[in-house]
Amino acid sequence: MSNSNSAKVRVAVLYGGRSAEHSVSCVSAGAIIAHLDPEKYEVIPVGITTDGAWVVGESDPERLRLVDRTMPEVQRREEIRPSLDPAHRGEFHFADGSLYATADVIFPVLHGRFGEDGTIQGMFALSDIPVVGPGVLSSAAGMDKEFTKKLMAAEGLPIGREVILRDRAELTDAEKKLLGLPVFVKPARGGSSIGISKVSRWEDLPAAVDLARQHDEKVIVESEIVGPEVECGVLQYPDGRIVASLPAMLRGTEDGEGGFYDFDTKYLDNVVTAEIPAPLDEEIIELVQSLAVETFQALACEGLARVDFFVTANGPVLNEINTMPGFTPISMYPQMFAASGVGYEELLDVLVQQALHRSSN
């Protein structure tokens, strides 16, 4: 493709990738491509296949939609390579060395490992090109639930009880007593509820741990936290202001086959609804917003994040942070900001401009 209008900011939208969240990334990218202001931005689509090949991306967002429970996937097309040379920053070349396109900023719409975990952020840092969203350290810490919780605890933020299982370790009797039942068993570095199980009987724990280890050799076992699930978006403006969205309360999350907010419940079954703003007392809403911003700052995030909570009888408890939250048509992050007065197109504009401003300073 040619960069026909140099007056426009050229945004390379990366999507797909090697993680189990490949298809969710595709749907997010389709929505972003459809909503980037064509008067201001020229989109350079870059797909990454499930086996890691970088290819010319899909420019038609309609081909990146969820249709009849069928999730899209990056197809093998002409391969391209990103330049890591600062003298040729933002360039993508075909295998024969000819130029595909030159980007001014990278929008890595990659969920999960090999994208949201600091790897892509570090790669593009080598070429000194602006990247939307948090940097290497924030992305890596936010992806790993163990280190997320450790940083939150160090900041005095409210977290639940958990045990980390490494190197084929199993829960001890003392750890089982600490956690109680039920527990949630998760890959330590994963998202979209992939590989997660709810365990109500200890005899079911080994199978749940084996499932989680299919996605990550490190597993986290968490006590159940009783209370509604509430999410809050965080957005950083180019001038440095950090704002929290109105929070959303999720309804129907327990209606998944596993009794929790699993992948099918999130994306396929259409049983979850959200109330925005969450029907909570004003002081609880303000506390959720404050904790979301504190979490964002504790991980030294930039640009954006979504912070998830359980609101218990004793107040909000942090669950996790997503440093590249979903941007699908049903994703909470854009919905929460739309309810807060920041539409999808404006939201993307703020994120791209924040990345450009950060790079210039």
From Swiss-Prot:
Binding site for Mg(2+) 2: E320, N322
Cofactor note: Binds 2 magnesium or manganese ions per subunit.
UniProt keyword list: ATP-binding, Cell shape, Cell wall biogenesis/degradation, Cytoplasm, Ligase, Magnesium, Manganese, Metal-binding, Nucleotide-binding, Peptidoglycan synthesis
Binding residues annotated for ATP, in chain numbering: 176-231
Binding site for Mg(2+) 1: D308, E320
Gene Ontology CC, one term: cytosol
Protein name (database record): D-alanine--D-alanine ligase
